[in-house]
């Protein structure tokens, strides 16, 4: 999902209700490599002959940088800017296959605010709101000079509101977090309105080693909760193990007022991972996600797997 925020979710996808201390900040880098299922040229052409404009890539890459700042103890604001690459894009239209090459560029900026409703240790609850801003290019062209469809561009051209909620609690030595984010797509480039998006699930984590003085576990969400947020007391290096179970849904897109019936889909993912937290506040996390179940409509390929890597630093 596009937007990223900061909080200690225990994993790389699920948000937590935690916020940064007032006046504290963090910066991070996140890399996501998604491998789709591979469909042959013949399969794409056959779908196109049925009126389905199907496409495939070799892989999709999202490399993003982000930062967060604690406005107050309850309110944290974060931004994330991605670089997007779609490798070896192939698309079929009216029975003809086109090799559109590699598509890459700066994507759309996401801005999120997280407001924590609860205080102190134990369970927590936070509300999340934000906006995806159309900073990405929408004018990439094929080798023949034809402008690519909006869904293949690095950017969308649309201003998309985002809203969500995050909750968390401790269960003995384990941390449990749950979150959901919804993104409303508005009209973007080339009279295209991409499908709305929903992402939500749960994360279970366990810390090995200790980090004294951190009254909350970290910061970060899509950059991963790879950074501890509090520097009041000395801390020691530690490891976290985590497992995330989450779902993703994408609605059908609309072009020039016409709904693309074969677009969109939904999937359920399982993503185990680990994170190393250094004594100096630098953290590195990685996870490998595999789809347990998916129903992707024919214009898009199924998912094979997703690898995520994140690095972050609190200050």
Regions found by a protein language model. Name each.
Residues 2-5, 32-62, 92, 151, ...:
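Surface-exposed strand-loop-strand hairpins of Gram-negative outer-membrane beta-barrel proteins
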Residues 14, 49-53, 94-101, 148-153, ...:
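Extracellular loop and loop/strand-boundary signature of outer-membrane beta-barrel proteins
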Residues 16, 27-31, 65-69, 79, ...:
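Residues on the lipid-exposed face of transmembrane beta-strands in outer-membrane beta-barrel proteins
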Residues 25, 75-79, 111, 120-124, ...:
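Repeated loop/turn-to-beta-strand initiation elements of outer-membrane beta-barrel proteins
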Residues 31-37, 81-87, 117, 131-137, ...:
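Transmembrane beta-strands of outer-membrane beta-barrel pores
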Residues 40-49, 192-315:
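Outer membrane beta-barrel transmembrane domains
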Residues 52-112, 116:
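Long, hydrophobic/aromatic-enriched structural stretches that serve as scaffold segments
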Residues 57-63, 103-109, 123, 144, ...:
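Residues that define the transmembrane beta-barrel architecture of outer-membrane proteins
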């Amino acid at each position: 999902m596009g937007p990223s925020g900061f909080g200690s979710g225990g994993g790389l996808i699920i948000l937590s209700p935690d916020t940064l201390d007032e006046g504290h900040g963090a910066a991070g880098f996140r890399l996501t490599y998604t491998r789709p299922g591979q469909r042959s040229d013949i399969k794409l052409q056959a779908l196109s002959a049925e009126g389905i404009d199907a496409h495939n890539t070799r892989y999709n890459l999202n490399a993003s940088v982000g930062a967060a700042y604690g406005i107050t103890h309850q309110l944290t604001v974060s931004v994330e800017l991605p670089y997007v690459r779609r490798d070896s894009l192939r698309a079929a239209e009216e029975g003809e296959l086109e090799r559109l090459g590699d598509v890459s560029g700066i994507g759309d900026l996401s801005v999120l605010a997280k407001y924590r409703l609860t205080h102190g240790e134990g369970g927590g609850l936070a509300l999340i709101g934000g906006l995806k801003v159309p900073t990405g290019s929408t004018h990439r062209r094929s080798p023949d000079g034809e402008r690519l469809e909006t869904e293949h561009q690095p950017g969308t051209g649309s201003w998309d509101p985002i809203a969500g909620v995050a909750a968390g609690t401790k269960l003995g030595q384990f941390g449990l977090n749950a979150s959901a984010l919804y993104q409303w797509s508005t009209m973007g480039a080339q009279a295209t309105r991409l499908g709305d998006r929903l992402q939500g699930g749960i994360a279970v984590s366990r810390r090995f080693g200790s980090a004294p003085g951190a009254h909350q576990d970290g910061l970060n969400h899509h950059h991963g909760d790879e950074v501890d947020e509090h520097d009041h007391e000395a801390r020691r290096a530690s490891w976290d193990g985590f497992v995330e179970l989450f779902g993703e849904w994408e609605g059908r897109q609309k072009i020039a007022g016409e709904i693309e019936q074969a677009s969109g889909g939904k999937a359920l993912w399982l993503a185990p991972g680990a994170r190393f937290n250094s004594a100096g506040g630098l953290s590195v996390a990685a996870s490998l996600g595999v789809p347990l179940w998916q129903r992707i409509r024919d214009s898009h390929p199924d998912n094979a797997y997703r690898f995520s890597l994140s690095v972050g630093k609190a200050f």
